[in-house]
Amino acid sequence: EYMSKYEHGKIYKLVNDINTDTYIGSTTQPLSVRLQGHLHYVKHRLSDERRLYTAMRAIGEQHFTIELIEEYPCSSRKDLLLREEYYINQSKPTLNTFTKLIDTRTSQELNRDRYLGRK
């Protein structure tokens, strides 16, 4: 039987021991692997100015730890992102750049918004 990688879905948060700033994310990887991915971006993508990476560079990556919020087995990336979005909206983390991860507008609404110059 085929197992989707999304059966290993999880919602996590990055916290630091300097202040109350947090980041919420989702992954299908082990948390230690996901944390290494963030640390790689901090070191190797210096032009990436997302809030999380700017904060990690400013106060030091050694001050950040990753914590599991919820194991969330699901069937698709969309399901996982919707769950992540739920937690972002609940706790309002300060280091997330985006709060809307899934665009739920219909194609008609998207076309209207593009025509009117909205994002």
What is each stretch, according to the model?
Residues Y2-R118:
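Structure-specific nucleic-acid interaction/processing domains
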